UniProtKB/Swiss-Prot annotation:
One of its GO terms (molecular function) is phosphotransferase activity, phosphate group as acceptor. It catalyses: N(tele)-phospho-L-histidyl/L-threonyl-[pyruvate, phosphate dikinase] + ADP = N(tele)-phospho-L-histidyl/O-phospho-L-threonyl-[pyruvate, phosphate dikinase] + AMP + H(+); N(tele)-phospho-L-histidyl/O-phospho-L-threonyl-[pyruvate, phosphate dikinase] + phosphate + H(+) = N(tele)-phospho-L-histidyl/L-threonyl-[pyruvate, phosphate dikinase] + diphosphate. NCBIfam families: PRK05339.1. This is Putative pyruvate, phosphate dikinase regulatory protein. The keyword DNA repair does not apply. HAMAP family: PDRP.
Length: 273
């Protein structure tokens, strides 16, 4: 009998780096062996303009929403929209803050990012996060020489969550989708500074994740082609040929967590440690 993993979308919204949420989400999801989260991490969400596209992304791929947003107006907007969409939302810090307020008899300051010491390491992480969010999914290709790492790979190989995980450690990371038959940005072939690495997975793994991805999508997918195993095999073959041609290392993420994938990337470039 085929042992299929059930996937679900886990949306993590933070007004800071998102480390608290990532840890909480993974600690909870580890208790459910039959289901694996597809993480969508949204750090540095501090105003309505930044939040609205996040809410649209949740609507496109419904799942569990965890957030650490101290601004009451933004937190209320998240809860209201999640109720409308019929998805669960949890303000992870609110019960803890309430307990502190009751015990200490004093209100919290509700200051964004108050848990972080304002040292050089913190500002390096924020700079890396801003860079990584600006260079997600092939955006701003002319800046790749400013990156520490450029991750490439076909759709659903964990490029974005791995990029954000690295950024939370101060590593500026860009990621680019490999689309069969579509040339990669010319700047990728002329850049000299960053480590370029390709993420791959088995055909079955990618097909499963893609099938789950389109469950909540209402448009924008050629569903049959997107999950077709023969088509995915061709995409992987194309990615492997690109990497062989340019001597870019491959990392198979099939049985790796995001942390393990990030560690494998760092191991390829010791100065990133």
């Amino acid at each position: 009998m085929e042992n299929r993993t059930n996937f679900f979308h886990l949306h993590l919204i933070s007004d800071s780096t998102g480390e608290t949420l990532i840890s909480a989400g993974r600690a909870a999801s580890a208790q459910f062996r039959s289901a694996q989260p597809i993480e969508h991490v949204y750090p540095l969400i501090r105003n309505r303009k930044q939040l609205l596209p996040v809410l649209q992304a949740i609507d496109d791929a419904p799942g569990i929403v965890l957030y650490t947003i101290v601004d009451r107006e933004l937190a209320s907007l998240i809860d209201e929209r999640c109720v409308e969409m019929g998805v669960a939302s949890v303000n992870v810090l609110e019960p803890v803050m309430n307990a502190f307020q009751i015990y200490l008899g004093a209100p919290s300051r509700r200051r964004v990012g108050a848990q972080h010491v304002m040292n050089a390491g913190y500002f390096a992480r924020i700079e890396a996060l801003n860079f990584t969010m600006d260079h997600d999914d092939g955006q701003m290709p002319d800046d790749y020489n400013d990156a520490d790492v450029v991750i490439i790979g076909i759709s659903r190989t964990s490029k974005t969550p791995t990029s954000i995980y690295l950024a939370n450690r101060g590593i500026k990371t860009a990621n680019i989708p490999i689309v069969y038959g579509v040339p990669l940005p010319e700047s990728l072939f002329t850049t000299t500074k960053p480590l370029i690495v390709c993420l791959i997975a088995t055909t079955d793994r990618i097909s499963q994740v893609r099938e789950n991805r389109i469950l909540g999508a209402t448009h924008g997918f050629d569903r049959e082609h997107y999950t077709d195993r023969a088509a995915i095999s061709e995409e992987l073959k194309y990615a492997r040929s690109l990497c062989a041609r340019h001597n870019w290392p491959l990392i198979d993420v099939t049985r790796r967590s995001i942390e393990e994938t990030a560690a494998a990337i760092v191991a390829l470039r010791p100065k990133l440690r």
